[in-house]
Amino acid sequence: MNLLIAAVLLSCGILVSTGHTDKEIGTTDIEYVHLIFMNHLDVGYALPSSLGYLGNVLNRYFTEYFPRAVKVTFDLLVLGYQERFIYTTHPWLVSLYLDCPPNMVLPSGIKLQCPDAESKTDFINAIKLGFITWHAGPMNMEFEMMDESMNEFGIQLSLDLDKRFGIDRKYRTVSQRDVPGTTQAIIPILKKMGISALSIGVNGATCPAAVPPVFLWKNGNQSLITLYHPRGYPNQYGPAPMKPGGLSKNDCAIVPGLNHALCFAFRSDNDGPPVDYKEVLTVYEIVRAQFPNARINASKFEDFIALVIPHQSSLPVFSQEMGDVWIQGAGSDPLKTALLRAQYRVRSKCIKSKKCSLDDPRVYNASRFMLKLAEHTWGSNGGILDNIHWTNDQFYKMLTVPNSGYQNASKYWDEQRYMTNLAIEALGNHSMVEDLKQEFLNIMPNVPDLTDFHQVDISSSQNCGGFDLKFNTQGALVKLIDLKGQNWAGADNPLGQFVYRTYNQTDFDEFFNTTTPFSKDFFLGIGKPNMTKNSKAESTVWDTKVTALFASKGIDVVLQWFGKVPTRLPEGMHFVFKPVEKSGYKWWMKKFEVFK
């Protein structure tokens, strides 16, 4: 029996003292500043001044942002400025841009606009000159949504780009923005793929983990240098030296004993690179005001990490789980999550059996689309600003309003889920397609065939393989006696209990204030204002009842729900396991094929 447990942790971590004796470095002691030019990527969600459909976002990068980055780079050179511009972007975007599917059309009706030959050549020349670069991760991922094989492919994407352009990149660094953390279990996988460091910039409204700005994150005997920026990616830089915004000295990574600092010239969600060379010059002036004694240079992650490596033994050590409060997105589209997991299962099995190889362009391209499923963008609110229409009847009426925020939001979610279809299309005639289709069929609810079943009395005890077991009227095991006579279940310790839970605004006020303490910008989406006032929202667990119990051979768990009505009100569906605690036994959680 496979049990998925999604753990959401926000660590108040324990740091281990290293006995470091080097003197603390102040900003006046910094002699060199490494400047990383980036902008935040949401593959979907939002765009400045237009609807953020996935297709619109990709087209904006392909037709405007990438050409603009190239132009800004060469304008500085041609005009004779000493300042340089290096644009750090994402391997998934670069790969899709260079090997662009020419006929890709999304459910919104938006067609992907591939670059023409001239734009592509200019982009490649900028790469070869070192002015366009990328970090080591595919994009802003939620790693725990993927299996080990998919995580490895995400890193492989950047390795393949490096190989394509003859780039010998040491001290490779994964960048993750918006998402406030990830699982400790990712460390061995990243180390296996040659990653030296992880850089995390937390959404400004979200509660960050209790970790220092630069530390060594350990999992057993493996570790990553980790740069952690709370309350922003950082935020976008300001307009002038007196207003630095996210380019203040407090936003930069500074390591005791090292006279180099790392600062981010960050632009916000899908804002692209600086609009022109003048904006780049302003960025340099802002940083010079923050570090008056330093040389400022556009840089890359690995250049700074190479300098931190000799100091890593003196960094604070964090050896606990961090977790990711944004993993709540996994429950926002249960069908997409089920399809995602099905695709990853089939792909992993196919690769392990040697029936699939990344040398096959079909498998490689399909894997590239599969990566998008675990990117941190699950959908969008479509611009809905509605704290009135909470009841189901009101909600259904709003769904019928043409071109409304509700209809836009539905299209956003459909578009994100559609990436599963693109993966299948990319596979063409590969044998994996039939396996995927069968997995997808298994996901879809169907009234079970009871041919090999026989009905049993719900109140009676059953025996299966020497185990004595009994179900309660809610369908949960309340007795499970093993071959040694130990009972693992009881009335207060049910196994496999389906729980349906609804919530009211009080629940969400507490949730919002805990996870999103620094801003009210997301209050409508996360806080559910006026939900209880304008509906009959209840905070309660609802009773379930078994109507019939049937027995068959073997052990399998398939939970299906028929006739479920759509609702705007928040609800939770849980499959609960609460075994009897026994001395000498403990829970193990499986993460990336490893039990912890």
Language-model-detected regions and their locations in the chain:
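Generic structural signal for alpha-helix starts
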Residues: 2, 183, 428-430
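Cleavable N-terminal signal peptides of Sec/SRP-targeted secreted and luminal proteins
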Residues: 2-18
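Short, flexible coil/linker elements and helix-boundary hinge sites characteristic
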Residues: 13, 292, 354, 428-429, ...
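Extracellular/luminal ectodomains of metazoan preproproteins built from arrays
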Residues: 19-21, 446-450, 591
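Catalytic-domain carbohydrate-binding cleft regions of carbohydrate-active enzymes
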Residues: 22-419, 536-596
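Catalytic and substrate-binding regions of extracellular carbohydrate-active enzymes
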Residues: 372-375, 382-563, 572
